[in-house]
Regions:
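A short SAM/SAH-binding and catalytic strip from SAM-dependent methyltransferases
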Residues: 64-78
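Active-site acidic-Proline motif in GNAT/NAT acetyltransferases
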Residues: 28, 59, 72, 76
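A short acidic, Gly/Pro-enriched loop at the edge of an enzyme's catalytic core
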Residues: 53-65
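Short, amphipathic alpha-helix enriched in basic
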Residues: 36-39, 63, 67
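Class I (Rossmann-like) S-adenosyl-L-methionine-dependent methyltransferase catalytic domain
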Residues: 1-3, 7-54, 78, 82-85, ...
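Basic phosphate/pyrophosphate-binding loop/patch that engages nucleotide-derived ligands
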Residues: 89
Length: 176
């Protein structure tokens, strides 16, 4: 199973048994944290520094992939399309991927641009991270353009309001 934008490794936990785990992140510091996390929770993952725009794998390598809070960090529409096509390329026929992105419909972003630089505190300093805020229709369009069969698009499970438009995250399950 490929974990794109694996960060510090927490999203590996549900898959630590029964899967060969691969994790990619553009940040070598996050991969160091993922290595520590895998040791702490007693699982092995092959970790690599890589870019989602050019995945370092042959075609049809993975049965499964996840990308939790990764694609919304890609800055341009064209690059997001390239990244989704790359995901499709490395999935085996019939392979499935689960991904989450931030939702543009969150009330805190109603009057703001879909391109945001969000401040984060890191080791006592403020750093800014890029976020593209997706709409449900935009995500569906990009995934369809990449050639995926869309199995489901919905708010995160913890969201309970009747209008999905206001959820924090959009979740998608796709099949090649």
């Amino acid at each position: 199973m490929l974990n794109l934008g694996c960060g510090h490794g927490a999203d590996f936990l549900p898959f630590r048994q029964g899967f060969e785990l691969w994790g990619l992140d553009f940040s070598s510091q996050m991969l160091q944290q993922a290595q520590k996390y895998s040791t702490k929770f007693n699982f092995h993952a092959t970790l690599m520094t890589a870019d989602m725009l050019s995945l370092p794998f042959s075609n049809h390598t993975f049965d499964w992939a996840i990308a939790v809070a990764a694609y919304h960090h890609i800055k341009s529409q064209n690059e997001r399309e390239v990244a989704f096509r790359e995901l499709k390329r490395v999935l085996k026929p019939g392979g499935e991927a689960f991904l989450t992105v931030w939702n543009r419909g969150q009330p805190r972003f109603w009057l703001k641009s879909p391109e945001q630089e969000i401040p984060w505190r890191l080791r006592g300093k403020t750093v800014y991270r890029h976020y593209h805020l997706f709409s449900y229709s935009e995500l569906k369009t990009l995934l369809a353009r990449a050639g995926f069969d869309i199995l489901a698009i919905s708010p995160e499970k913890s969201y309970h309001l009747p209008l999905k438009s206001f959820s924090r995250n959009i979740c998608a399950l796709v099949r090649k």
